[in-house]
Amino acid sequence: MLVTIRNARPVGGTITAPPSKSMAHRAVLCAALAEGRSHITNLEFSKDISATLGAAAQLCARVRTGADDAVVEGLGHFVPLAAPVDCCESGSTLRFLIPIASLTGQAVSFTGRGRLMERPQSVYDALYREQGLRFEQSAAGLTVEGALTPGEYRLAGNVSSQFISGLLFALPLLSGNSTLHLIPPVESRSYIDMTRSVQAAFGVQSHWLDENTLAIPGGQHYHPCDYTVEGDYSQAAFPAVLGAVCGGVTITGLAPETLQGDAAILDILRRYGAKFTQTEAGIPFTKSPLHGVDIDLADCPDLGPVLMVLGLLCEGTTVIRNAERLRLKESDRIAAMEAELRACGGVLESEGGTITVHGCANRLHAPAGVLHGHNDHRVVMSLAVLALSTGIPLTVDDAEAITKSWPNFFEAIKPLGAEVEYA
């Protein structure tokens, strides 16, 4: 799908952050693993969340969805699978479910779309082989079989926290205690603690023995509960950058106290010189001069694409470090954003996981043709921010990629002054 994004009027208005995709994944799985009825409210049925709900229904739960909520009734047992579990393009769904699959007493196969089956699973591969379990991955899918055993687990702390969260879901249900030793540095710690927080709401506990070691008591049970998903800082980063550049934007629906790692966007924007206040009522942005900064992306890689846009629109140079994981997402996000921003006159370069972006707002221009969305939701949304921030109409392909995380994105930005034309 092609969309053209342009300014219908000067940027300004109020936008509500969508529900947190990260927290919704976790709540759905905890509810599915509990025996009984849980009610999850403030949901948005993106493709990723729909994949997790579908997997829960295949494995161990009855699921009924409403307009913005779901009732998940955990069966208290796993059911025989008649077909592979389709994770669509959701890395969280796949990586969270692999250890859970080891609880089912059967071989479980997973399929996916796009680049999902190309994304590395070496952490689980090594762990399963170490325990003598089956782990087979190919371009067509992934199959695991065999039961994890309680005990000592050692994982690199600088891999995706999704692997650690996946083990956190499954290990409390084993018969004995387990310990997760994370080899420092531990990145994305906030996402580990987010998993633990949602688990605690469903009655499952773990605790830090020290900054790198998690103790997970065995023999626990998830208990059903009612759970409300808070607003998503990862998605709010797009209107936040727009507000920082243009002013006049207010974001509502975000909890001031949160475990979401991408809440770091507010601290990062303050360092750029952005002017805003945060209250329970919302976050209003006022236009102010912005200057380049040095950013460590290790704990918040999803912010990378939109921060590359911001780097072009401020004075000076922005250096984004520890961004290697961007190359292993729905697209190679570094290469994708470099190509599209250069097509608009952007000046930037990368080496490995370091990206250098030069402020060049006065040199930006309309591209010669259609920009490519690279089938990546964050690339598409970042290019929309570029269009509205600069007043340069942009036509982007693969625009349907937004359904992965924020299906209503284009409608949501219209009250901020956007005009969106579909083709």
Tell me the role of every PLM-derived stretch:
Residues 1-423:
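Short, structured segments at the rim of ligand-binding sites
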